[in-house]
Amino acid sequence: MKPIGVQLYSLRNLAEKDFPGVLKKVADIGYKLVEPAGLWNVRPSEFRKMLDDLGLDMVSSHTPWARSSASLGEVMEIAHILKLDKVVCGYMPANFATLDDIKRTAEDTAKMQEILERNGFTLFQHNHDFEFARIDGKLKYEIFREYCPKVKIQLDCFWSTNLGKEDPVEMMKIFSKEIISIHMKDGICKQDVSGTKMVNGILERPVDLMPLGTGSLPIKDLVANMPESAEAIIVELDYCIIDMLTAIEQSYTYMVSNGLAAGNK
């Protein structure tokens, strides 16, 4: 079984008030891993020590976020302090709007990838729903991959449905060779999403989500078809219809008690 982690963006409102306390609660639930998206005014070295003290680890981070070749020096330095060999990139809907946009985005990504590779880092792409829209019947993400064939993917299974238009298991199979980890959220896949914006450098797409196992995402089928290359299953609930800490604990219990992921308890 793959280890289970939680994307700390899910707990951002609590982290703003008591970041060390949030990390302790995550460890107490039994999560093996965390994936940060911001360090809440904690130095990278201090954050790394906090994880070590709590017996937590991470295989990836959404901090720092690779946005251009010009920022990669700082990005690599932070990743090194965090003891990571992977760096994340991701985009706005406008970056995938047209064929020309996709090509330009892929070319920029390939440039960053080349620099990172020379320095011992792997670049991975985190998706939302819009990459799984189609142009002339072809997935935009497939077009992106053609122009940037070396890129690795952190597949967000819920978003890969493109709001209920695609089969997430089929999407996983299509990109199985590129997948390095999985983001798992749950909810009613077919819903409208509006109000997209950037908040503290992170793409925010308001969506109604639920604890894992209570929505319409075929989680058991996804885990059964997960490629060996996936290092971890990371729970991420951008929003939730119930208290977030409760949802994170319920999601952990669902995954571990059903033998879908490995935790510490």
Functional labels for PLM-detected ranges:
Residues 47-63, 112, 116, 142-149, ...:
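Alpha-helix-loop-beta-strand connector modules within alpha/beta enzyme cores
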Residues 20-21, 71-74, 101-110, 137-142, ...:
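Charged helix-capping and loop-helix junction motifs
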Residues 1-86, 152, 253-265:
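N-terminal pre-domain/capping segments
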Residues 118-216:
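Acidic/histidine-rich catalytic cores of soluble enzymes
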Residues 203, 208, 215-224, 231-236:
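H/E-rich (His + Asp/Glu) clusters that bind or coordinate divalent metals
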Residues 12-17, 33-46, 63-71, 94-103, ...:
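Acidic-and-aromatic substrate-binding clefts and catalytic sites of carbohydrate-active enzymes
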Residues 5, 35, 60, 88, ...:
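Conserved beta-strand positions in the central sheet of alpha/beta enzyme cores
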Residues 70-108:
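Glycine/small-residue-rich loop that forms an oxyanion/phosphate-binding "nest" at active or ligand-binding sites
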